[in-house]
Amino acid sequence: MAQSIRLDRAGGARARIYQAALRLFAENGGSEIAVSDLADAAGIARGTIYNNIAAPENLLGEVAVALSHEMLLRTEATMQAFTDPAERMATGARLFIRRAAEEQDWGRFLVRFSHTHAVLQEAMREPPARDIKQAVKSGRFKIDAEKIPALLSMLAGATIAAMNAVIRGDQTWRDAGSHTAELLLRAGGVPPAEARRIAQRELPPLARAQHQPRKRKTS
């Protein structure tokens, strides 16, 4: 069973508010939630919302920051022992795609809002940007350095598209993840047979986050 989303390390009412907000934002697709609806979804009183959220109108941004921070920590912890930057890039994309299948509110939130909230884009682009640069520098990827931004954009777009396909039920996460990873590896210049082997390796469980302070960003 997938680990439940933990968007706030303090736990308690604030974590329940974030979890309920994530679900409502994912379902409705809007940028604001009525406090009464949020209180009902979280199973708490309206006053508890105001006691824990200073500006409810900014809740979408708060949830995006928390989600981004949590997934960054967990993907980094999962791939701590990985030394091949190509495999790290491929595995990172597959972790996002699998989680979209296992936690569909989380996946819908990312699909809906990743294009408009920079902090969500950071969660998807920051680790693979490092991996792609390292792969190009070491010769693992056979592309010119000036093409790194294009490959990174391909990765972000393909991952979101695969997540959406999985949520809609068009593909299994295994197929969507391995096919996306294989094509991204081939775009980087990895030979086809090797790209397929890497993309079809057993995917490790997503590690639990070891929370660390992180500077809050607004989008």
Placement of each model-derived feature along the sequence:
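Conserved hydrophobic residue
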Residues: G30-S31, A54, F141-K142, Q171
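Short hydrophobic/aromatic patch on the recognition helix
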Residues: A42-I53
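Amphipathic alpha-helical packing segments from all-alpha helical-bundle domains
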Residues: L72, T91, S114-I160, N164, ...
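Alpha-helical DNA-contacting segments of helix-turn-helix folds
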Residues: N58-L67, L110
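Hydrophobic alpha-helical connector segments
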Residues: E62, L73-W106, R112, T116, ...
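C-terminal peripheral helix-coil segments that are non-catalytic and often amphipathic
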Residues: M1-A2, R130-S138, R168-S219
